[in-house]
């Protein structure tokens, strides 16, 4: 059964995922570190799992829990690279789907930017997340959900 796992520490589309999966039979797990604790109540198909605040603790838990039928939503290219051949789909919150063809290019870009920062340089960061970005993500996730439902 398909399950969506969210890298929840800095994910701007958590509410969209929850709304779009209501009444689909798809369960959602939000994984966060304790430093991002929230008392927010979610619908019955959503659970939240908290892990220690250590570096990459959320990533390790996602790798541990994910299965071949899962969809993972993360903006972390390193985590995506670990999951791209393990799970059904790995998505960025901008709606793009990671795959074995594009992940290496993204990792290379991340490495080059890290090298620039080490040398005291600067590079342009990502633009602010907009309502249009959210709509693009929602359309992409809906396509994924419809495709999965067709396979069931």
Curated annotation (Swiss-Prot):
Signal peptide: none annotated. InterPro entries: UPF0178. Pfam families: DUF188. Belongs to the UPF0178 family. This is UPF0178 protein SAOUHSC_00689. It comes from Staphylococcus aureus (strain NCTC 8325 / PS 47). The lineage of its organism: Bacteria, Bacillati, Bacillota, Bacilli, Bacillales.
